[in-house]
Curated annotation (Swiss-Prot):
Record lineage: Bacteria, Bacillati, Bacillota, Bacilli, Bacillales
HAMAP family, alphabetized: HTH_type_CodY
The name this protein goes by in its record: Global transcriptional regulator CodY
Residues bearing the modification Phosphoserine: 215
GO CC terms in record: cytoplasm
Organism: Bacillus mycoides (strain KBAB4) (Bacillus weihenstephanensis)
Principal subcellular localization: cytoplasm
Length: 259
């Protein structure tokens, strides 16, 4: 397969995504096919975002690593020393993707390390490995193109996470600001009583202890529930089951108490 055809195959994957998140596993499968190598997309913390195997490596440690989808911490950290594409590294290299305990079996093993960079930040590493055949310029062009695509996708996911976090926080702040002083006081006592993200409480007991009416507690819970911050369910004589749905809620509540 010529370089142009291989590039088109990678482009076809991106075009088929059509604005949806690119699946790192599918991306790895396509890279594996066009570069004809084992492919590992490794995050900053060593998590395997995606991988595909071209040549099976019979080694228990490698099998466990793939099953756990996690590269060893020491190896992951060492990858940060590679700041530009390093190709055709032998099995004696610190960066080899082949099991060092079986060097004699993988004497022809070659590894290529491609940093994944986006927004001026190291986002991860693309690790390629194969036996015998050297990685040529065409392979490296495809690898660097792929690492750019992966970097853009990681940045997009990070931006979405930040946006979602900001949205969750805004919802919580609006919900809390909608509470009256007595309702806020009631909520603070309720979650002191729960001491966690879910549990049972008896509203009348809290009302008596704090010196507020039961209706204040009910109204406060309704406001938070309508905002999607909590879920509550009456269990009759047992009390009310409450579960926090927005993980920013308890953080914001704690901030209010310290201010």
């Amino acid at each position: 397969m010529e370089l142009l055809a291989k590039t088109r195959k990678l482009n076809a994957l991106l075009q088929s995504a059509a604005g949806k998140p690119v699946n790192f596993r599918e991306m790895s499968d396509t890279m594996c096919e066009v570069i004809e190598a084992n492919v590992f997309v490794v995050s900053r913390r060593g998590k395997l975002l995606g991988y595909a195997i071209h040549q099976q490596i019979e080694n228990e440690r490698m099998k466990h690593m793939l099953a756990e989808r996690q590269f060893p911490e020491e190896y992951t950290q060492s990858l940060f020393n590679v700041t530009e594409t390093s190709s055709n590294l032998g099995v004696d290299s610190d960066y080899t993707a082949f099991p060092v305990e079986n060097r004699e079996l993988f004497g022809q093993g070659l590894t290529t390390i491609v940093p994944i960079v986006g927004g001026g930040e190291r986002l991860g590493t693309l690790v390629l490995a194969r036996l015998g055949q050297e990685f040529l310029d065409d392979d490296l062009i495809l690898a660097e193109y792929s690492s750019t695509v992966v970097g853009m996708e990681i940045l997009r996911e990070k931006a979405e996470e930040i946006e979602e976090e900001a949205r969750s926080k805004a919802v919580v702040q609006m919900a809390i600001s909608s509470l009256s002083y007595s309702e806020l006081e009631a909520i603070e006592h309720i979650f002191e009583e729960l001491n966690g993200t879910e549990g049972l409480l008896v509203a009348s007991k809290i009302a008596d202890r704090v010196g507020i009416t039961r209706s204040v507690i009910v109204n406060a819970l309704r406001k938070l529930e309508s905002a999607g911050v909590i879920e509550s369910r009456s269990l009759g004589m047992k009390g009310t089951y409450i579960k926090v749905l927005n993980d920013k809620f308890l953080q914001e509540l704690a901030k209010l108490k310290t201010n």
